[in-house]
């Protein structure tokens, strides 16, 4: 293999924030955050969906509320529309 062109492959702790589940997987993702896990320090990445929380794997339906783009825009800039009227 050519030296210097491949990303670092290392163990990373992923945190599924939906069900508060942590797991260690090898990954090339980069992050500045770290976490102490089983006596070792690992890079730390949060995720919203994994096999622990996805309805296909759990067999349970779960409503994941994500604010829509229009609602987000209205929340951020709606005050300006009210002031101009």
Swiss-Prot record:
Factors inducing expression: May be induced under zinc-limiting conditions; in that case may be repressed by the zinc uptake regulation protein zur.
| Full protein name | Large ribosomal subunit protein bL31B
By sequence similarity, the record places it as follows: Belongs to the bacterial ribosomal protein bL31 family. Type B subfamily.
Q: Which organism is it from?
A: Vibrio cholerae serotype O1 (strain ATCC 39315 / El Tor Inaba N16961)
Q: Which GO terms describe its cellular component?
A: ribonucleoprotein complex; ribosome
GO biological process terms, alphabetically, are: translation
Query: Per its UniProt record, what Gene3D superfamilies does this chain match?
Result: Ribosomal protein L31
- InterPro entries annotated for this entry? Ribosomal_bL28/bL31-like_sf, Ribosomal_bL31, Ribosomal_bL31_B, Ribosomal_bL31_sf
List, alphabetically, the HAMAP family matched: Ribosomal_bL31_2 (MF_00502)
Keyword annotations for this protein?
A: Ribonucleoprotein, Ribosomal protein
Assembly and partners are described as: Part of the 50S ribosomal subunit.
